[in-house]
């Protein structure tokens, strides 16, 4: 490839609306061009990276036995109504009507369509297992698109869907996809971690997320440095304190705490650690034909509620936060002074494991400007229902008992789910087993954000000069930068010769024949992030040398023209 036959458009400054590093660098490198909110055109440089990513994904999916299909972006609404996701997905699901007033959606995922394929095409257990995958455009009508392609509305995704005859078969299919994802991210050349996760809106019984490690990542990744334990913040288990609850040593006392509506302020006034306080969080659930049920969740003062965990408490699946009016009726006071002792109306009390292990604690007295001190379970109030309700923090014990937990940041780029029979039962996707009995197919689904990979890779690999692509997904593996290409016959001839040699060897090479000044030429390719550069100049040619430099190298190395290919291959193999 020659630059004169390509399209290169770089910027010295990023647009004002570009917030994060990847967005700024992709815009400056001419990889993407904004069309509208959350909508981007992928320019030639960016598209080359996408094609590299797709190629690796496609190779590994095929190797794992998945079969490629291509499903429509526009899907009939009736399929989504069958599964109930028409109503559950909310405004992110773009719904519209055609000229005949029929409902359609712009797909964010394709569980409904692929399940429809399975129920019409698969009849017998002999046709199972099967795994369909596609690399296709998706659309989510994000309320606030931001961060460039990291949270756009239109994006490209690889989504796969496995169908098995039973749960044991699903475990095999799931492991195949987990292993394939591991190989994919290894081939991308990215530092990543697979973590246990919650299934969220897609549903199912088990899942893992694949995160690219980056300090700028939105997601907290919980892991144990001394073991293989890893989970996202939603799924990471906060184990119960190992020590038994201490005996009560203080009397229950109502204490005046004027204006202290926060645990931190109460602890400061009383001169006690924040860990001696308990925070009260009030939730509500709807009761058909009656008043909402009020719930009081209790956590240690320095801990934060994990809403996903709370939703798993029996009866709290569809909780909402209580209104101020509901709180006033149930407790007789406003938030900041609430507690489980002496409520006006009966409420359901649920304590986090750590809160349930506390003694002599401080909690709201259900009277403005007052808190109780010296509160103890069993003596001052009944023993509560106990669940894991909180986010873990660094230093917590690892659930596998092999050390303590640490936290890093990551960007989610892949997710694998065990769906089970949620969709197959809803859509009557069944098969006949060897006994002639009808059984629901057991499903898994597996997604990778193709375009999101670009942003995540940049967030992990950049410096002050620009992007540093891993060689496997770089737009070009090497760029030849001739100094004086338009002026020196010797430079032009050697650059053309080297270009031809590398092309013949299967190297993805760019020859910059634009005649740019060296500084501008080097700056463009450092910004774009090509992993290796070969400089051809008159001075070096007179000495029988070319300059070879990796994007992360501090200085160039002199290499004989005949040795460039071998040197490049050796570096690419590292």
From Swiss-Prot:
GO cellular component annotations of the record: cytosol
Reactions listed under catalytic activity: tRNA(Pro) + L-proline + ATP = L-prolyl-tRNA(Pro) + AMP + diphosphate
Record-level GO BP terms: prolyl-tRNA aminoacylation
Keywords assigned: Aminoacyl-tRNA synthetase, ATP-binding, Cytoplasm, Ligase, Nucleotide-binding, Protein biosynthesis
Location(s) in or outside the cell: Cytoplasm
Extent of the signal sequence: none
Name the UniProt record assigns to this protein: Proline--tRNA ligase
Pfam families, alphabetized: HGTP_anticodon (PF03129), tRNA-synt_2b (PF00587), tRNA_edit (PF04073)
Family according to the record: Belongs to the class-II aminoacyl-tRNA synthetase family. ProS type 1 subfamily.
Quaternary assembly: Homodimer.
SUPFAM superfamilies: Class II aaRS ABD-related (SSF52954), Class II aaRS and biotin synthetases (SSF55681), YbaK/ProRS associated domain (SSF55826)
Annotated organism of origin: Ralstonia pickettii (strain 12J)
NCBIfam families, sorted: PRK09194.1, proS_fam_II
Domain notes from UniProt: Consists of three domains: the N-terminal catalytic domain, the editing domain and the C-terminal anticodon-binding domain.
